Amino acid sequence: MPKVSQEVVIVGAGETRVGKLPGMESVQIQAWAVQEAAADCGLRVPEIDGLINLDPYAIPNSMFSSTLSEYLGLKPRFLSTVDVGGTVTAMTMLQQAVWAIESGHCEVAACVYGENTLTGRPPGAQGLALRNLLGGEEWEEPFGLHGMVTPYALLNDNAQMRKPMSMEDYLASRMIATPLRLFDCSQVSDGGGALILMSRERARARGLKAVSIRSMAMQSTHNSVAQTPDLQELGMAAAGRDAFAAAGIGPDDAQVALLHDAFTISVLITLEALGFTGPGQAGHYLRAGHASLGGRCPLNPHGGLLSQAHIGGMLHVTEAVHQLRGTAGRRQVPGARRAVVSGNGGVFSVCGVMVMEACT
């Protein structure tokens, strides 16, 4: 079973501003995120002796973990640069941090994801023909959902989308790839997020409110989506089964869900794959209000990639930490003790599911 040591916990979660950060390079953004996470738990940055980060897509660098370490003035005993894809990158960072601390390679680890994707100079990339990818009408009809517009970002002062949106606004947005419109697609964002981990014993000694990772599971089924003959048989369901089994819970036992939402259809697929609702029922589940604040299991109360910012899904994890510590402000889910976080990299190429809990 893919269990995670309960003797290592998350004690700090930090975010930079998101949106446009002109003039800031990725190393500055990542450093800012680490500083915010350290401040969140009252840690001095020089106490960090483990550093795990992302090599930015905007302007790729070699040895970027040592670049960031040098910029922060650290002398870490453990370094790693991770890129698995989407929120699964953040999960893999956390797994490495747990292993590094548990094995004595470091005592305090920082995991950081951030870059200047919006204002930087990303290399050319080939676009995806989403209509061909999704198969057109066969995706629209089973789910019956033409658009999911979340108001949660209005409750998040650090969100890129801060204006209310009506159904008329949504329907007036241009079609990108039928049935997906502009507002079915996530943001392009500058920004960063970071997490601080240490042993449970050290956290207790410091009097810190902590969050544990109860379980984590992943599965990769392909790289190119052309190698997936059936788009309804993806790694998300397998990762979810493993993560829930290892945690000894099911989706109904979670009080909040942070699901990767690069596109609205990603949420529909994930809700069904993880068993929050049955096949073809995700649209009904959302329209019934089960995923709204005050509903059965609120979904992405920070606004997600669609409305807060697309920082590779790292802000899904920082939001989970805030929800479980009761520090999410106006968007706090009352009584949140357990969160389910999902991620996918590429076109569901690699899928991951993580169960997180508030420490008692």
Residue ranges and their predicted role:
Residues 2, 43-45, 62, 74-232, ...:
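Acyl-thioester C-C bond-transforming condensing/cleaving domain
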Residues 9, 49-52, 110, 255-258, ...:
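Conserved beta-strand elements of the Class I
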Residues 35-48, 239-253:
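Phosphate/pyrophosphate-binding loops at sites that engage ATP/ADP/AMP, CoA/4′-phosphopantetheine
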Residues 55-64, 220-223, 261:
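Short, surface-exposed loop/turn segments at secondary-structure boundaries that line and modulate
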